[in-house]
Amino acid sequence: MKILFVLISILYAVYCFSSEEDVDSAYLANELEPVEDINSEQYAALEPKEEQERSCAGMGRDCKDDCDCCLNIATCNCWFGRYFCSCTFGDYQTCLRKKGKCKRNRPQSCPRSNLNRKKG
């Protein structure tokens, strides 16, 4: 049984190599036309568009003050005073401060946490 399996494997390998050589020689002799993809233009790489500057900064992005951050409860957290500032999560009080002082990116409503409310 093993000998039969080895013999079939060898015959199959010889067949694969011989058919590959036929295709290569026919292609070199221009007997076969190269396959053209009719949808190649559809998948062509498009030129990247320049990113426009956003009016607000997402979480983890650079900021100058709380009004630069997008989320209602986001605050501008700075290391070493005013250096390495980025938007991080704040709280309800942050939202109220932003509502009072920010003219752009002003929160419409401030979400309240349901953790402290007693249900009953």
UniProtKB/Swiss-Prot annotation:
GO terms of molecular function: toxin activity
Primary localization: secreted
Signal sequence coordinates: 1-16
Tissue: Expressed by the venom gland.
Post-translational changes noted in the entry: Contains 6 disulfide bonds.
Cysteines paired by S-S bonds: C56-C70, C63-C76, C69-C87, C78-C85
Propeptide boundaries: 17-54
Subcellular location: Secreted
Any Gene Ontology CC annotation: extracellular region
Agouti domain boundaries: 56-95
Keyword terms of this UniProt record: Disulfide bond, Knottin, Secreted, Signal, Toxin
Domain notes: The presence of a 'disulfide through disulfide kOR' structurally defines this protein as a knottin.
Family per similarity comment: Belongs to the neurotoxin 05 (agouti) family.
Name listed for the protein in its UniProt record: U13-lycotoxin-Ls1e
Organism: Lycosa singoriensis
